[in-house]
Curated annotation (Swiss-Prot):
Compositionally skewed regions (Gly residues) per UniProt: 8-19
PANTHER family: CATALASE-PEROXIDASE, HYDROPEROXIDASE I, BIFUNCTIONAL CATALASE-PEROXIDASE
Cofactor entry: heme b
Record text on cofactor binding: Binds 1 heme b (iron(II)-protoporphyrin IX) group per dimer.
Annotated heme b binding sites: H263
InterPro entries with a match to the protein in the record: Catalase_peroxidase, Haem_peroxidase, Haem_peroxidase_sf, Peroxidases_AS, Peroxidases_heam-ligand_BS
Signal peptide, first to last residue: none
Name this polypeptide is given: Catalase-peroxidase
Cross-link (Tryptophyl-tyrosyl-methioninium (Tyr-Met) (with W-100)): Y222-M248
Region (Disordered): 1-29
UniProt superkingdom: Bacteria
Pfam hit, one: peroxidase
Catalytically driven reaction(s): H2O2 + AH2 = A + 2 H2O; 2 H2O2 = O2 + 2 H2O
């Protein structure tokens, strides 16, 4: 046992309060590491933002002189600094890597990662082995950030700098959209189960990568450039490349373009033994001021720099756009060698020395490649794409430009969030486009009339609430995808998901479609109503009825203006990533999920940008409204299904109920303590609100004698937040983790 955990030979406190104990104060997490954490629901509080919760970054960015920023960045590119000299006199390669690694953490499975927020500034990303020396890139940019201040976020600066680096080396980029507001604390994300850098405990079976992760080893962005676990096998490496790039939403064509385009520039660094390298930024000394990986190998910089341990230069013109990557890849045969640092890499066999030295104009080298570069030649799928790009350099340039734009903008959501004069006009399917509104919206009188027609269709409260939730709750605050706007629940794959009860969904959509046709065919003044609006309005009408049936009159907010997406502009395969594997709000959990049900609930709430109170009130409301997937009665602690009441909390907290586990590990049976008769059934998601102390405190608020009306009004407000989470047209999206509920 290491010194931090201590040896507990005497049977005392497991945290070791002795002379040799660490100075770290034990947290609740140290005592109860398996307890459900709500930390993710409390992230990014306005209290951590030095500009305050009302800071409008979009307005600041729109006042920025972007041309001046770009001009200044062009100067930085060739202004080599003695403390970190530029390879070939140009920082382009370094800044491309910085931007790539800022954006490349994106994973399509949950939309997390990516360039938004500027998370590369914080742990653990700032200290990942794959991000070695990018601390220097950020310091090189400090004069730019310092000059433009609040008008230019670090997150936007990282991506913009990558674009300018490409442009300064003769490449034409596809465009740039600003609008990435900075975050001010690390994102608490699951990056893997390992406790050591480059660990690979994330695999099961025959190299089955953990479903929630996007990289092959802890601390890497994608793959090990030496090959799987350092095995220099290009074909095996191709398997890893295909898997990890697909999890970043890239197909084979885009993958080849990205790798080859990025490796047209710059070099890798492996001048000496990695043992000379000091700790990463988070582990460095205080006097190092956030800089890590200090090297004691000779000068430690310039020609003596060690970063990845690989020493590779791909192109004859490493600071100029060319097709040399593919020309060299196919024109030479390759033999395995090792870098000065001992890393596996490849050198062109019997090749002339045609590659420039980064610091000595009188020296030349042979072409070199990474194992993962050779994958583009020797993998049977990548090879024809690579050869096509070799023979069609203009198409390659266009493919790289588009793939780079996708890489650096994939987590930004709808194009409505893109800011600035460099936003391309072309519509791209991966942006999940929704048509702009071209008609007046419905007014209050229309809304009231439509509600009555909807309630007259004969569907239950449960039916209408379930469909509205299914439409809206696909939203992910991580990459701003999903949500009710666009009504893509009408299309594959969402219309066929089992959790959405396809037969009922089809019936509801058909009847709402009839109402839409009647209204749009008779409304005056050009007014129209979208299916997206009608689906949400149906849920709102049902909730108002459910509240009224319980004795509380509440107006559920409704803001019209959603539009309907087109099926031809809906990438079904891409939307499959939004399929719920668990949705605790509907008491749905698939056994394939890698999280416990209650953890999956918190994860879902985090993606919906809900606070703990909002999560609590929504679960309680959805249960009594009968909105469980598949009509399950688990957690439906009420005899008045369809009435919006606080019954879930009242009965959960009632001590007459005793809970026992069943043969199903996630299901429990409630018994009357006196009669031993069955009362309710529940899942782990239901019982966590009585078990976890913070959630029990929330539940008690709504279970009190005076809690019912507060519960109804808080439910309506939290419901409205979910329904509008993706509404980029009515203000800030739901990227805050809390909102003020009723007093």
């Amino acid at each position: 046992m290491n010194a931090e955990s201590g040896e507990n030979a005497g049977g005392g406190c497991p945290l070791g309060h002795g002379a040799g104990a660490p100075r770290k104060r034990p947290s609740n997490r140290d005592w109860w590491p398996e307890a459900l954490s709500l930390t993710s629901l409390n992230q990014h509080s306005p209290r951590s933002n030095p500009y305050g919760g009302d800071f409008d970054y979009a307005a600041e960015f729109n006042s920025l002189d972007l041309d001046a920023v770009i001009a200044d960045l062009h100067k930085v590119m060739t202004d080599s600094q003695d403390w970190w000299p530029a390879d070939f006199g140009h920082y382009g390669g370094l800044f491309i890597r910085m931007a790539w690694h800022s954006a490349g953490t994106y994973r399509i499975t949950d939309g997390r990662g990516g360039a938004g927020g500027g998370q590369q500034r914080f742990a653990p990303l700032n200290s990942w082995p794959d991000n070695a020396s990018l601390d220097k890139a950020r310091r090189l940019l400090w004069p730019i950030k310092q000059k433009y201040g609040r008008k230019l976020s670090w997150a936007d600066l990282f991506v913009l700098t990558g674009n300018v680096a490409l442009e300064s080396m003769g490449f034409k980029t596809f465009g740039f959209g600003g609008g990435r507001a900075d975050t001010w604390e690390p994102e608490e994300l699951f990056w893997g189960p390992e406790g050591t850098w480059l660990g690979d405990e994330r695999y099961s079976g025959e190299r089955q990568l953990h479903p929630g992760l996007g990289a092959v080893q802890m601390g890497l962005i994608y793959v090990n450039p030496e090959g799987p676990n350092g095995n220099p096998d290009p074909k095996a490496a191709a398997v890893d490349i295909r898997e990890t790039f697909a999890r970043m939403a890239m197909n084979d064509y885009e993958t080849v373009a990205l790798i080859a385009g990025g490796h047209t520039f710059g070099k890798t660094h492996g001048a000496g033994d990695p043992s000379f390298i000091g700790p990463e930024p988070e582990g460095a000394l205080i006097e190092d001021q956030g800089l890590g990986w200090r090297s004691k190998f000779q000068t430690g910089i310039g020609p003596d720099a060690i970063t990845s341990g690989l020493e590779v230069i791909w192109s004859q013109t490493p600071v100029k756009w060319s097709n040399y990557f593919f020309e060299n890849l196919f024109n030479f045969e390759w033999e395995l060698t090792k870098s000065p640092a001992g890393a596996h890499q490849w050198v062109a066999k019997d090749a002339p020395e045609i590659i420039p030295d980064p610091f000595d104009p009188n020296k030349k080298r042979k072409p070199t490649m990474l194992t993962t570069d050779l994958s583009l030649r020797f993998d049977p799928i990548y090879e024809p794409i690579s050869r096509h790009f070799l023979e069609n350099p203009d198409e390659f340039a266009d493919a790289f430009a588009r793939a780079w734009f996708k890489l650096t903008h994939r987590d930004m959501g709808p194009i409505a969030r893109y800011l600035g004069p460099l936003v391309p006009k072309e519509q791209l399917i991966w942006q999940d486009p929704i048509p702009e509104r071209d008609h007046p919206v419905i007014d209050d009188a229309d809304i009231a009339s439509l509600k009555q027609k909807i309630l007259g269709l004969g569907f239950s409260v449960s039916d209408l609430v379930s469909v509205a939730w299914a439409s809206a709750a696909t939203y992910r605050g991580s990459d701003k995808r999903g949500g009710a706007n666009g009504a893509r629940i009408r299309f594959a794959p969402q219309k066929d998901w089992e959790i959405n009860n396809p037969p009922l969904l089809a019936q509801v959509l058909q009847k709402l479609g009839e109402i839409q046709s009647d209204f749009n065919g008779s409304a005056t003044g050009g007014k129209k109503v979208s299916m997206a609006d009608l689906i949400v309005l149906a849920g709102c009408a049902a909730i108002e009825k459910a509240a009224q049936d319980g004795g509380v009159n509440v107006a559920v907010p409704f803001t019209p203006g959603r539009m309907d997406a087109l099926e031809e502009w809906t990438d079904a395969q891409s939307f499959e990533a939004l399929r719920p594997v668990a949705d605790g709000f509907r008491n749905y959990y698939h056994e394939s999920h890698f999280m416990a049900p209650e953890e999956a609930l918190v994860d879902k709430a985090h993606l919906l940008r809900l606070s703990a109170p909002e999560m609590t009130v929504l679960v309680g409301g959805m249960r009594v409204l009968g909105a469980n997937a598949g009509g399950s009665q688990d957690g439906v602690f009420t005899h008045r299904v369809g009435v919006l009441s606080n019954d879930f909390f009242v009965n959960l907290l009632d001590m007459k109920n005793e809970w026992t586990a069943t043969e199903h590990k996630n299901r429990f049976q409630g018994l009357d303590r006196k009669t031993r008769q069955p009362t309710w059934t529940a899942t782990r998601v239901d019982l966590i609100f009585g078990s976890q102390s913070e959630l029990r405190a929330q539940a008690e608020v709504y279970g009190m004698a005076d809690g019912n009306e507060k519960f109804v009004r808080d439910f309506a407000k939290a419901w409205d937040k979910v329904m509008n989470a993706d509404r980029m047209d009515i203000g800030k999206p739901a990227d805050q983790f809390s909102q003020k509920l009723s007093a």
